[in-house]
Amino acid sequence: MTRKDGRAYDELRPIKITTDFVKFPEGSCLIECGDTKVLCCASIEDKTPPHVAEGEGWVTAEYSMLPRANRERSRRDVDKLKLSGRSAEIQRLIGRSLRAAVDMRRLGERTITIDCDVLQGDGGTRTASVTGGFVALALACRKLVEEGYLGSTPIRHFVTGVSAGIVDEQPMLDLQYSEDSRAQVDLNCIMDETGCIIELQGTG
């Protein structure tokens, strides 16, 4: 069996990250992993949710797909009057992963919200969102330092994600949709720059 796009089984798709893709957020990027494209934007607010300890900050995330990000149109969550279970699960994963990157005490009493909007989905949207979300987060934190609000960046780890799986009994890295949709095992791995695993999420 060979992969549809000609990659080796342990080969990533080409990755391209365009920073400052839109001008209004404190940090933004477009991440492209093969044909998967996700717009990630970081917004800063000078307040925190009630559950956050005094003097600390918070990082959270939201995730959605454009109606025609896939082969067939899907309804917007707002049209269904509730967040889909899949979107809720993915944005919790993104939020947990990105919080592992930040020293909340150093961030101070601020909330950084990462919006991840899938423009085109061809597998690996959640791991692309984690990677792109981290880039947007780091850019927003750099802006806080450059504008004098912080003395140093609160980023303590670099965070990224990649998918892996087993398709037709063959282990593979970075599954595209044609592989993901028929995988016997689908695994998402979130790690930092030291190789420490932050989260594993798998189905089989």
Where are these regions (language model features)?
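Short, Gly/Pro- and small/polar-rich lid/capping loops
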Residues: 1-32
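Buried hydrophobic packing segments
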Residues: 94, 98, 132-141
